[in-house]
């Protein structure tokens, strides 16, 4: 099988390319830029393009499948050549489905918690010796790649993103997987550049539920009123399995589950993670994992990459970084750290980096999301607004949107670093939240200075 990737350098795309290479496929690809870690990983397996850029000469009649990434544009010369030759062109999710259509497909959907729930499921299945393929949105400890596709595994666990499939396929990715078992963790408006209204966004989840295979299962968080409505209003012939936060206690900085199997210590914390864990438990039960085996396996789960990651700690302070960027994720993450360390003050810092978060109309969704922080800081780079072709934001507008008069708004990375290092860190924790990089701020070095 000969497969060509247009935009092979993307996080998801290069992992799929590696998975197909390991499967014995003949893989080629192109991109206009490839960054680390994609660059080294592709080069290691001889898949890094010799030259950067697009070239229609890369497309020939003997290619069995062309996989088109979101980074490419609809007028991409390689895409146009493939269309001219009548080659089969797939979006990333379409090809994932093509590779997994004969397996039991488990799809984890929702506005938040998808990666963590998927990671929890894979961690448990791995420890319990259950053979499963997977596709997940972050690099996980104990797993070499973010995509695994084999002929032998009877089950595949897929993280189901609601963003668009490709430049020429405007369907949300998770509409293409046709799950046998689906999970919805929560619904909170996101991707406003694609779904301009909340109702339009919710509609995508209605359609997702309708696409669950006949006699399939929907596992859903009943604490979320919108999810509950989507699940219970569906006419699809499926079984419903609700979940919510499990009984637990926090003792001396450690969270314990209170279960029929006894008191289970965890390495993760935060109510949102406990809810995620309960959803993962129901998925694993659907795949034949006993409660006893689940609880034994989940005890040493340390969390998904970039989720409440501990960068440094001392007796007086700790520094965490988290991928949180949407309002619901920010609120849950701030509350988790504050509740886990209720004897310490919390300084929470959020970078506005995505199209949605920098959109003034959407910014009001962040109202009181950082209420539990003793000090709240919002950082954004005005150049990012220009790059995304959005109108300028003022500090006053940001403060008003967050409904917090004492909110500190900073627009220069060096100034942010200096501000944080000037604070006293006795009995104080720092939480840095972003899907970006705070414009290159070295958080590991910052953590060392804060906790020394």
Give a label for each model feature.
Residues 1-36, 42-50, 62-66, 82-87, ...:
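ATP-dependent carboxylate-amine ligase
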Residues 8, 30-31, 69-71, 92-93, ...:
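Fold-independent oxyanion-binding glycine-rich loops
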Residues 19-23, 57-61, 70, 74-220, ...:
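Phosphate-binding loop of NTP-binding sites
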Residues 34-39, 57-58, 73-76, 142-143, ...:
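Short, charged/polar "capping" segments at the starts of alpha-helices
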Residues 51-54, 90-97, 135-138, 234-252, ...:
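Beta-strand->loop->alpha-helix junctions that form or flank phosphate-binding loops
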Residues 116, 272-278, 325:
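A generic structural signal for residues located within well-ordered alpha-helices
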Residues 254-259:
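Short polybasic amphipathic segments
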Residues 264-269, 317-321:
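Short pre-catalytic strand/loop immediately N-terminal to key active-site residues, enriched for Gly-Thr
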């Amino acid at each position: 099988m000969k497969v060509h990737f247009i935009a092979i350098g993307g996080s998801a795309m290069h992992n799929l390319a590696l998975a197909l290479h390991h499967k014995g496929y003949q893989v080629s690809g192109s991109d206009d830029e490839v960054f680390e870690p994609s660059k080294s990983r592709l080069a290691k397996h001889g898949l890094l393009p010799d030259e950067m850029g697009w070239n229609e000469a890369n497309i020939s009649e003997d290619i069995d499948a062309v996989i088109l990434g979101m980074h490419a544009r609809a007028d991409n010369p390689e895409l146009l050549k493939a269309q001219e030759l009548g080659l089969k062109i797939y979006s990333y999710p379409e090809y994932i489905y093509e590779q997994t259509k004969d397996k039991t497909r488990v799809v984890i959907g929702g506005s938040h918690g998808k990666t963590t729930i998927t990671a929890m499921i894979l961690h448990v299945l791995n420890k319990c010796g259950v053979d499963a393929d997977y596709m997940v949105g972050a690099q996980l400890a104990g797993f070499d790649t973010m995509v695994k596709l084999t002929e032998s595994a009877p089950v595949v666990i897929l993280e189901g993103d609601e963003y668009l499939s490709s430049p020429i396929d405007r369907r949300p990715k998770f509409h293409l997987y046709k799950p046998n078992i689906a999970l919805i963790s929560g619904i909170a408006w996101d991707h406003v550049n694609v779904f301009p209204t909340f109702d339009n966004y919710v509609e995508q989840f209605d359609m997702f539920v309708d696409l669950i295979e006949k006699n399939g299962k929907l596992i859903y968080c009943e604490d979320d009123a919108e999810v509950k409505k989507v699940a219970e209003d569906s006419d699809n012939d499926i079984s419903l399995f609700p979940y919510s936060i499990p009984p637990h206690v926090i003792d001396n900085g450690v969270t314990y589950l209170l279960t029929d199997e006894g008191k289970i210590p965890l390495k993760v914390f935060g109510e949102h993670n406990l809810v995620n864990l309960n959803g993962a438990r129901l998925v694993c039960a659907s795949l034949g994992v006993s409660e006893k085996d689940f609880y034994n396996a989940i005890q040493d789960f340390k969390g998904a990459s970039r989720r409440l990651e501990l960068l440094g700690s001392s007796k007086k302070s700790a520094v965490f970084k988290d991928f949180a960027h949407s309002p619901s994720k920010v609120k849950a993450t701030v509350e988790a750290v504050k509740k886990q360390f209720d004897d310490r003050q919390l300084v929470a810092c959020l970078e506005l980096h995505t199209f949605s978060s920098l959109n003034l109309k959407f910014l009001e969704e962040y109202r009181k999301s950082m209420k539990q922080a003793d000090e709240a800081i919002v950082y954004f780079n005005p150049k990012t607004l220009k790059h995304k072709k959005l109108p300028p934001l003022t500090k006053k507008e940001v403060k008003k949107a967050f409904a917090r008069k004492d909110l500190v708004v900073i627009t220069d990375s060096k100034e942010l670093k200096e501000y944080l290092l000037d604070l006293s860190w006795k009995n104080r924790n720092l939480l840095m939240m972003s899907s970006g990089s705070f414009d290159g701020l070295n958080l590991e070095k910052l953590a060392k200075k804060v906790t020394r």
